[in-house]
């Protein structure tokens, strides 16, 4: 998997010179201190899920849960970004939690849902952007879902009501995720005015206008 991602990034770097006069928007995102971890479990699958009680839960408010993206994106820019082949991301069921908590993809992409727990899960969503119900499946099994419509998809487990995750489906590939330190770098963009958006499942959405010059990069630090 790591080699596949590395190869995809190298391919993107090689493709970027075709974007004449491309610049980069980068910076640091600051968020408030992460909240307390959730605990407990509801609707455990009889005879199995109770053994998972007390497992660590996902913290809320982490900077790595954020998604940073821009618009508008020219068709030729999107064509370059979309040309880089990347493996389908995985939203795993692990330790009675969805891992990772947040996934961002472009419309037309797929997501795999592997079960890594020794119990059954039933992953579903009722979101208008993508409704699905994967049914119960055991450890070692996986299901794949295609996402063709932009929008926010809230993902849950019918068996374990405290499990929740988010799939943000964007109309293009001009997005990024901040590192644990909050640092972020967007893909190369042609000169022009862009709307820079930050979305976080716990903190909401912010946006600001950013101008990419004909030469040089732009540093835009963000905070909630």
Indicate where each model-derived feature is located:
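Positively charged n-region of N-terminal signal peptides that target proteins for export
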Residues: 1-5
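Short helix-onset patch at the extreme N-terminus, typifying the N->h transition
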Residues: 6-9, 28-30
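Bacterial N-terminal signal peptides
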Residues: 7-17
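Extracytoplasmic copper-binding redox domains, predominantly the cupredoxin/blue-copper superfamily
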Residues: 19-224
